């Protein structure tokens, strides 16, 4: 893989800049936007970026940092899903706490924002408290977003309980956007000043990157990733007016800045040190880019990937038509098309051949996989196994120089599994999934040296690109994710069945 980003340089630059910012205050509330862990978007658009860079940065500052996690009560009620992991936001909070503890980072508490006694939220609160985790409940702020006098009063932020913290940097994070991070920071700021403490607020958001051009593919890829939020990148007019320098920010931050500035000034009783929303940020990711062309190409591929993802989400009913069309429009505005993703044409062409050969209207799943050396392999679904499983077996055979004619998995192993699924468990679809085939392969590897060699090649699939001609099941997507394979799908179901699709 060609590298476009220097991870070590970025970590050094970023930690230094955060420490410089905290020197101005007794306590700094640092709003962490985006993903704290497993930032797969950043990893894809910035080749060389460590997906866990942010948490490693915090680990470096662990003596000075504690963490507050925000969760919007409405997201618990409607079981909002974190798309890249396929888990709900409340479950992601539990995962996040475990991961933070794994990096020796102190989790202060969980804040439930816009709380109004929702039943599912109360169950989640009980679950946390009975595991010894502090929980604070913040109701919707009276007067928000325009009535600054009410917001900054005992009727507004004053109604929220004060969260006791002990360290100079308080990171406020969440599973996703709209979780109430900013409101929590400002509420704390209000309480700190009421107690006579000098506290500050800053924002750490990786995208958009303020010091690369507005129409750079890296920033356009961010628009594509947040198409459901309708985020639009813009020139920060406040920054230009203050410093006569061009900086990129996004519409929500620019639109809310005048009110945010007034709130901070009302809390502190003095003029804000921030002249623009860009000033509030501490992001140094742009300084880690070492090969702009590599980053541009990776970002273009991400824009195509996002268009596929949004099309599938539209088909499933998760996003509206406007979101679907906007993702497509962003791709077209960059003069990109679906076929610019190398694995798309081989998958579609093979699927068309199979359909013609079978002379049936049924859709056949074909999965194409591009290996690190540029080789593109395909696998198709059959009565025996899914297309995802077939292409993985073909890939490990390729890496291990094993002939196509050699069976890696003995029929003695496969037949009992299929019988179990069909006869004992009563499954409608008996074809083995990718995970089931990998388990069968691992069993064979115990007695078959060839299968053992093939098993050893699985780590080589990390970072590979794949495309499926039909929508994959959640299980198949998760197996590919665990293997480190980025997969896209055509927005087509494998059959007309509504429940027994995958």
UniProtKB/Swiss-Prot annotation:
Pfam families the record matches: DUF1846, DUF1846_C
InterPro entries associated with the record: DUF1846, DUF1846_C, DUF1846_N
Gene3D superfamilies, sorted: dip2346 domain like, Domain of unknown function (DUF1846), C-terminal subdomain
Family: Belongs to the UPF0371 family.
Name of the protein this chain belongs to: UPF0371 protein CLK_3516
